[in-house]
Amino acid sequence: MLKRNKLIISLFLMIAIVTLSACSNSTQAPKQQDDNTYTLKIHMVINEQDPVYLGYSEFKKGVEARTNGKVKVELYPNGVLGNDEDLLQQAMLGGNIAVNSDAGRLGVWVPEIGILLAPYLTDTVDEMQKLVKSDLVKKWSTDLSQQKGLTVLSFNYYTGSRNFITKKPISSPEDLNGLKIRTPGSPVWQETIKSIGASPVALPWTETYPALEQGVIDGAEAQDPATYGARLYEVGKYITKTGHIQLWNCLVVGTKWFEQLPKEYQQILIEESTKAGDWTTNKVLSNQKELEDKITAAGAVIKEIDTAPFKKKTEAVYSKLNYQDLRKEVNKVLGK
């Protein structure tokens, strides 16, 4: 009987040891995961004074604080990492790269996204803000992730309305006939400039100033923060407020890199990007008059004009790029 009791006690002790060992291993595994650190490098061609750069600084602070430094964010302005297209490819392949991008570039892969840069798509910034946060745009972003391996953290970085910067005054679309205007190379940009009557020239943003200065191009189109940051007003004195495109940027990462993060960190990146986008939008809107005052103080002429003729001309873009049905979907989201 005594031997039998000793055997039972021994068995209980062995079970207890195994159980404790298993519990110990299960508590240590997540701890090992928590010890991992990740670095995200954000590429952009804009400089350190641009509201979008400042917005990404807010993103950096929020992410690093909420992950206790486990996700580090590094900012690389002025195109020092290379060009957008190459870096988007690196992100697709799993690199720890994020790119400050827009609907024009992403629309090359998911054509529906391109409509976000279509001319005069919405009447107000509030309408556009509603659109970029809608389920419709989230669906397109999901398609981008599934088809091309790029994940949009958020699409709500308003950078301003695009205006023309030229060496001569512009009052109507006819004044732009035949002028060589720098614009990005994606279809929605190119067709918008063509519809107005100008000749689009695709150049990297960093080459725009010398090209305008040397007469390689006759003008450019850009939002005020970018115009001011690049000092384009020094070589293109006349700024015509056509507001033909509202430029909303997005923060894009590679899906492979994103999905290796713990789910908690993935959610933090999305939430902090959305916060940073809203911060950027408010910054651009609140600084608009001050920025225009600085540009005119530097000797430039900013001109308000009747945009109705430009709207009429650019209607052709919607049929050219088969955006008619997409426009109906957009208007449905906006309650129009």
Segments and roles (model prediction):
Residues M1-T39:
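Short, low-complexity disordered leader/linker segments with a strong preference
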Residues S24-D126, L136, S145-Q146, T151-K336:
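N-terminal secretory/targeting leader peptides
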Residues K130:
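Short beta-strand-centered segments that line the small-molecule binding cleft or hinge
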Residues W140:
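Basic, amphipathic alpha-helical recognition segments used for DNA target recognition
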